[in-house]
Regions:
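Glycine-rich phosphate-binding loops of nucleotide-dependent enzymes
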Residues: 2-256
Length: 256
C-alpha cells in the first residue's frame, strides 16, 4: 500500500464525544505527487486534514512521515521534520509587509526562539524571502502590508510563508475559499507549479479544480474512504457519482 509514500495515515479514527468523525481511514500519500482530498459536506475532510497536520490527535490509529510515527508530535516539531501547512483562514501578521511576513517565517526555522532577532543577525533571509514571494507571484508587492493585499494575494502570501520552512510536504486546506474566479485560477496555477517540485496534499471542495490538477484523489464520505485513484478513475466510479457528484454523467462532465 505504501510504496514510496512520504506520509501515511494508518487506521485513523477520530471521535468527538459520541460523534465519530473518522473511521479507520488509511491513506498513503505518494512522494512527489499532488493528492487531493474531496468529499461532500460533513465527509470528514477538515478533521482528517487536522489529524495529518498535527492539529488534532487521532482517537485511534497513527500518522507516519518518512517512516517515523509522528502521531502526537507538536506542530513545531512537524515543521522541523519538513511538514508545512496553510489553513482556510489566513494567519498572517496584517500590519507587516509581505516581505516581513515571509522573512519572519524563514527566521523561525533557524531558531525556535529567533523570530524577533535583528534581521542583520540572519544574513540571506531577505533574499530568500524575496525569492519565495517572486515564486508565488508577489514579487511586485514586497512592501505592501498583508492587510493591504487582495484576498487571493493573501492566500499566495500564506503559501509563501509555508514554503519558508523549506517543506518536503505542503498541506493546503481549501486554498481557494472565498476567492473570485480570477483569483481561483491564479492560485490553482500556482499550486500546480509548486507540485512539480514538492509533495502537495490539497483539501478542496471544488471538483473541477481538483480533477484538473491532481495526480491522485481520495474521496471521503461519512468519515471513511469511499474511493481513491487517478482523476479519471474517480470520475468513472459509480459510488462517487452516487454520493458526491449526485447527477451521474452530467456532473462528471462538469468536473472535467
Amino acid at each position: 500500500m505504501n510504496g514510496d509514500a512520504i506520509l501515511t495515515a494508518e487506521g485513523v479514527g477520530k471521535t468527538f464525544g459520541a460523534f465519530r468523525a473518522l473511521r479507520d481511514v488509511s491513506v498513503a500519500f505518494p512522494r512527489g505527487r499532488l493528492t487531493s482530498i474531496i468529499g461532500p459536506n460533513g465527509a470528514g475532510k477538515s478533521t482528517f486534514f487536522n489529524v495529518i497536520s498535527g492539529a488534532l490527535l487521532p482517537s485511534e490509529g497513527r500518522v507516519v512521515f518518512e517512516g517515523r510515527d509522528i502521531t502526537g508530535l507538536s506542530q513545531h516539531m512537524l515543521a522541523r521534520l519538513g511538514i508545512a501547512k496553510s489553513y482556510q483562514i489566513t494567519s498572517l501578521f496584517p500590519r507587516l509587509t509581505a516581505l516581513e511576513n515571509v522573512r519572519i517565517a524563514a527566521q523561525a526555522l533557524v531558531s525556535r526562539f529567533g523570530m524577533w532577532r535583528p534581521r542583520s543577525a540572519l544574513p540571506g533571509l531577505v533574499g530568500e524571502a524575496t525569492a519565495l514571494l517572486e515564486e508565488v507571484g508577489l514579487g511586485q508587492r514586497l512592501g505592501v502590508p498583508a492587510a493591504g493585499l487582495a484576498h487571493g494575494e493573501q492566500r499566495a502570501l500564506e503559501i509563501a510563508v509555508a514554503l519558508a520552512s523549506r517543506p518536503k510536504l505542503l498541506l493546503l486546506d481549501e486554498p481557494t475559499a472565498g476567492m473570485s474566479p480570477e483569483e481561483t485560477r491564479a492560485i490553482m496555477e500556482l499550486i500546480a507549479r509548486l507540485a512539480t517540485e514538492r509533495t502537495v496534499v490539497l483539501v478542496e471542495h471544488k471538483m473541477k479544480l481538483v480533477m484538473n490538477i491532481s495526480d491522485r484523489v481520495v474521496v471521503l464520505h461519512h468519515g471513511e474512504v469511499l474511493a481513491e485513484g487517478t482523476p479519471d478513475e474517480i470520475r468513472a466510479n459509480d459510488e462517487v457519482k452516487r454520493v458526491y457528484l449526485g447527477q451521474g454523467r452530467p456532473a462528471v462532465a462538469r468536473a472535467r
